[in-house]
Amino acid sequence: MENRLIILGSGAAPGVPSLGTGFGRCNPENPKNVRTRASTYLEYKGVRLLIDTGPDMRAQLIAQNIRNVDGVLYSHAHADHLHGIDDLREINRINRQSLDVYAGKYTMKKIEHRFDYLQEGYQQRYPPSEPGNERGQGQQAFFC
């Protein structure tokens, strides 16, 4: 197995082009100026590591035909580096085991707080929404 490093995305937090400023000073004619949020895939001695899980992660992995990773390293707790974390559940289904997650203490605390439902032993706190169920003020029901 070969070692490899793939830059999955290198765009700023809003992506390029952004909704607000478009391409900014970047040339829209250059395809390299269409960039997804920052993420990197590292494969070394058979270990597959994802660095950050931005909101574009699923599309990035599909584009590179990456279907599995062994772990994730988080650089920091900004949304553009971790809000694709929910898509790791599909990788859990493939592996049938938990993923190793690495981060500094502050970042790990933020992840555990924002995404508590991803932790082992999580108990669902709300009954599933079904057509016809009433919700009180302040509660939300989504039907997909």
Predicted regions and their residues:
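Binuclear metal-dependent hydrolase catalytic cores
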Residues: M1-C144
